[in-house]
């Protein structure tokens, strides 16, 4: 975890990709916890980093259905594939000024490019 001093120096400029549909399942072992809770959906979130663990404004999320035969390994692999789609797409959107963050508020001016990169399954605003 990064210190509050470090985070404050880069406020609003540090991203994290997290393997869950935040705010659910902050921290480690997300796939095992999802399976243990018999959830039907899982996914990935991109958010701005704050001093609190896996907290901060959500920029985007992608979800998938948990298959009846999923194991921690298979679910992890499928979520990782979503991470590989979503993270670079969000970074591109930030670089091209399609997403704006003011405090805790996130506003997207254009989601079409991000949707085309990710196959259209991105959630804006992020899932509740």
Stretches found by the model and what they are:
Residues 1-109:
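Donor/substrate-binding cores of folate-linked one-carbon enzymes
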Residues 101-128:
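SAM-dependent methyltransferases
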